[in-house]
Amino acid sequence: KAAMDSGVATLPITDMKAYRQRLSEFVYNSAFVMKPIFARAKADPKRIVYCEGEDSNVLLAVQVVVDEQLAYPILVGRPAVIEKNIEKLALRLKDGENITIINQDDDPRYKDYWQGYYEKNKRNGVSIELARRDVRRKTSLIGALLVENGDADGMICGTFSYSHLHLKYV
């Protein structure tokens, strides 16, 4: 586009969107496989919880998801930390606009969530205190509860640590 605007390009590009699509197919080897998946996601975007919402790599991925309109991201984490990382990375993510931040320290659903978690797991050794603590601290558990209670359609977790540590909450 810059070459066309400056007059350096010898052949004008009539359809910039199609041209970019062709270029992306060269860059991404998985484009052939992923294209129909992305098209389906764009047609019906879902609410996806990112359990490690404070992580820089997660935020970079969320920016791509927002830019491509693939889903409505829900980030679990402390708003101050998330917003600081968004600013540091110069991202265009805004709570309440193109993302939602779930602050486990003051979410109004906290009581319902820990009580439900306790009722479901009390026979497995989960005490009331443990339920309260885990629903406040375990981001994968928070994500799973959001999905279970219909507040999200899916979740992504396990970007750090071992997967089996996250899967026990799913």
Ranges and model annotations:
Residues 1-158:
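Contiguous, glycine/small-aliphatic-enriched amphipathic segments in soluble metabolic enzymes
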